[in-house]
């Protein structure tokens, strides 16, 4: 699909950057010669807009061997960022998709500045081409055919091999994020814990990874009482899924991802209202993020060791479901007083974290749609983060900044630990109250990470969007897929 050339050679459409400057860039000046100065006129009359995300279409009318030019407004160069570029290109690729363009090119060097080099631009372009044109996978009987871009050419004077490599990496990042989106959007009667495990096994086999899927009896033998408690009310069997990627000869410095895989959450006996229950098919967004990251890792083969662990079940009501006031024993041996059955994700993750450590994880990152509290605190754009190790957190933060997936650190103080340890009947309680809900959930998980360097990512606000946006339609976003993969790719770098 991707090609690199030094000159244009006939395309349906070409994308060109347009910055807000006193004069036209050299790229536009050269093209304007073929248009006999008409582009300058269009700029002066503001029919070619330089505003951020503005897309202006100009037909060549036979003046060049390209049918149409799409000028992408990027605003002032001093305010140009990777986020600006992602948003603008997302809109540009959507425009091409709507026009049913199958052969497009991009004047890559027109997007390059002192802040962003050609490698950065190529990576983002290929990534966003997938993200921006993602279509919801629906179950409608009348499905519309979608015309997809078949050929994309980067026009640049830079080294072709380096640009091709950047395009490939960006494409893989975008595709894997879309894989996660599709998982999150699937209805809960289709995506059960069993189906999620089957998907994970297929992924592992495709990329020659080791894997384990623990069944209920094996979980009982290992004492995974926290996950099993959440599963008590369900007719669907639970699964503890593990994918193991060995990128080094020695099994050292193992990065462990733990993704919450609650395929549907009614709240259990602490029942959600109808409004709060609709959409809970997405409560396995953490699992999807982890699997998306493993898809990227499988494709790009970084020299790192990585474990992905997914505790999976649904949380439903029945005569056998677990109840408030129950006391359960986790795999770690720590006992937990259940005060809220709707705080089930942290119970499943507790056993997932302990199991990841058992498999050899030296570093832990858990990802979960864990609390409504994080949405109240940070909104729908920023992922909440907590940690027991600032060095590991800084690496996660840098990866999130590189991928434009913002995170914000929330605290863990001793008094927070005291609240989750406050139980007359057990070592811990799973829900100390509404105050500081996001912090309480993360603090609870920290009790199981213990001394292992750990970062918690609460994607409850960022996993899905209610409306269409520059990088895709309403629904799942694939939050943290690219951040996790970038963390692995950059892990340990100074």
UniProtKB/Swiss-Prot annotation:
List the keywords (alphabetical): Aminopeptidase, Cytoplasm, Hydrolase, Manganese, Metal-binding, Protease
Enumerate the residues binding Mn(2+) 2.
260, 265, 283, 344
In which residues is Mn(2+) 1 bound? Answer: 265, 342, 344
Cofactor remark: Binds 2 manganese ions per subunit.
A GO term from the CC aspect: cytoplasm
- Residues the record marks as active site: 272, 346
Q: Any S-S bridges, and between which cysteines?
A: none
Note the InterPro entries from the entry. Leucine_aapep/pepB, Macro_dom-like, Peptidase_M17_C, Peptidase_M17_leu_NH2_pept, Peptidase_M17_N
Please tell me which top-level EC class this enzyme sits in.
Answer: hydrolase
Q: Name the predominant localization.
A: cytoplasm
Q: Which one Pfam family would you cite for this protein?
A: Peptidase_M17_N
Record EC number: 3.4.11.1, 3.4.11.10
* Catalyses which reaction(s): Release of an N-terminal amino acid, Xaa-|-Yaa-, in which Xaa is preferably Leu, but may be other amino acids including Pro although not Arg or Lys, and Yaa may be Pro. Amino acid amides and methyl esters are also readily hydrolyzed, but rates on arylamides are exceedingly low; Release of an N-terminal amino acid, preferentially leucine, but not glutamic or aspartic acids
Instruction: Tell me the GO molecular function terms.
Output: manganese ion binding; metalloaminopeptidase activity
Names of the cofactor(s): Mn(2+)
Task: Name where it's found.
Answer: Cytoplasm
Where is coiled-coil annotated? none
> Which GO biological process entries does UniProt record here?
proteolysis
Q: What does this protein do?
A: Presumably involved in the processing and regular turnover of intracellular proteins. Catalyzes the removal of unsubstituted N-terminal amino acids from various peptides.
Similarity comment text for this entry? Belongs to the peptidase M17 family.
Under the heading NCBIfam families, the entry gives: PRK00913.1-2, PRK00913.1-4, PRK00913.3-5
What name appears for this protein in its UniProt entry? Probable cytosol aminopeptidase
